[in-house]
Amino acid sequence: MLKRDMNIADYDADLFAAIQEETVRQEEHIELIASENYTSPRVMEAQGSQLTNKYAEGYPGKRYYGGCEYVDKVETLAIERACELFGAEYANVQPHSGSQANNAVYMALLNAGDTVLGMSLAHGGHLTHGSPVNFSGKLYNIIPYGIDENGQIDYEEMEALAVEHKPKMIIGGFSAYSQVCDWARMREIADKVGAYFFVDMAHVAGLIAAGVYPNPVPHAHVVTTTTHKTLAGPRGGLILSNEGEDLYKKLNSAVFPGGQGGPLMHVIAGKAVAFKEALEPEFKEYQARVVANAKAMVAEFLARGYNIVSGSTENHLFLVDLIDKDITGKEADAALGSANITVNKNSVPNDPRSPFVTSGIRIGSPSITRRGFTEEDAKNLAGWMCDILDNMGDESVIEATKAKVLEICKRLPVYA
């Protein structure tokens, strides 16, 4: 018989210790990975609920199993809130991840071998936008576009490539681009060649929900996102559209039964909570601070003589190009990590080094903002990072910085 007082600590000491260690790491490290965030205890409560027990293949009102009347309510809430949040007519909340959502779009709209125009991974795109090592690059004919010498998306190149190659789909969106995307211009290019326009807004979904970054939903045929990152919900995916029932049916079929079986109802409940949180005024204030903190960090890096790809940021992230500093991204990642500052190494445009080494680091502000960092805190943090990068290998600088990190983490806990 199951008892409510069963717990991991008493039953599985090894696993409990690992969880506790990760909890301490999150509290005592400054998190600057742009794709990470801290979700709320309410979301975690939903994910730890009895909904994890329920199998619910199908969609609300059209399930293959009985006993789904209450999980139907949960999924319907998530759908309605997602549509309200992003101004969409259609939402599918079942994808287990952003990559699964993207896969569903490919399967719904394309045939194997079709031509797709997507942002080059080396210029800020995502694996699922056509990388040769990903399903998208293996199954489809990918034509990459990139950024110009000023670090801006080259729309003239995009249009020329579209006219030349006649893609069936054009992808907007990114994993490492710090500027504003012109969704309307991209749709014009897609319409010119009769292509679908698909946007992956995973990185900026929270900013879009708050109105501090342009919304692609009115422009794209279909939009996908993750539900974590800037949206600060559970790890999962979401598909949105305003383009009519025929497309909605194709998308639903591509998710189930095309790509997945039973949905994760406990995660969908977490999504419903996160969407409700994102509709609150406080969420809009948070997202404005996310952008302000990223800008404050960029200003300090520039003042200290560092090169920022695109020269600025208009969202939550930016890339520091370390080529001129003769520091690899891998080395910078390790040095900053020694001071409890977590970043990720990242390729920069025209990077001479391999993706396993790289010449840059990607920095994001969602997590530090979530725990209460001000613009002054963000500026100081960027300065500490420059101190380490200016003095690579100097353990005294690392130890002094680590002490500052531990102090501010204690002052601004993730979960108070």
Swiss-Prot record:
Binding residues for (6S)-5,6,7,8-tetrahydrofolate: 121, 125-127, 245, 354-356
Subcellular location: Cytoplasm
Cofactor: pyridoxal 5'-phosphate
Gene Ontology BP term (one): glycine biosynthetic process from serine
Catalytic activity, reaction form: (6R)-5,10-methylene-5,6,7,8-tetrahydrofolate + glycine + H2O = (6S)-5,6,7,8-tetrahydrofolate + L-serine
Keyword flag Amino-acid biosynthesis: yes
Keywords from the UniProt entry: Amino-acid biosynthesis, Cytoplasm, One-carbon metabolism, Pyridoxal phosphate, Transferase
Molecular function terms from GO: glycine hydroxymethyltransferase activity; pyridoxal phosphate binding
Site residues by UniProt (Plays an important role in substrate specificity): 228
Positions of post-translational N6-(pyridoxal phosphate)lysine modification: 229
Annotated disulfide bonds: none
Broad class of enzyme this protein falls into: transferase
Keyword Signal: no
Pfam family, one: SHMT
Subunit details: Homodimer.
Role: Catalyzes the reversible interconversion of serine and glycine with tetrahydrofolate (THF) serving as the one-carbon carrier. This reaction serves as the major source of one-carbon groups required for the biosynthesis of purines, thymidylate, methionine, and other important biomolecules. Also exhibits THF-independent aldolase activity toward beta-hydroxyamino acids, producing glycine and aldehydes, via a retro-aldol mechanism.
Protein name: Serine hydroxymethyltransferase
Source species: Aliivibrio fischeri (strain ATCC 700601 / ES114)
Lineage of producing organism: Bacteria, Pseudomonadati, Pseudomonadota, Gammaproteobacteria, Vibrionales
Gene: glyA
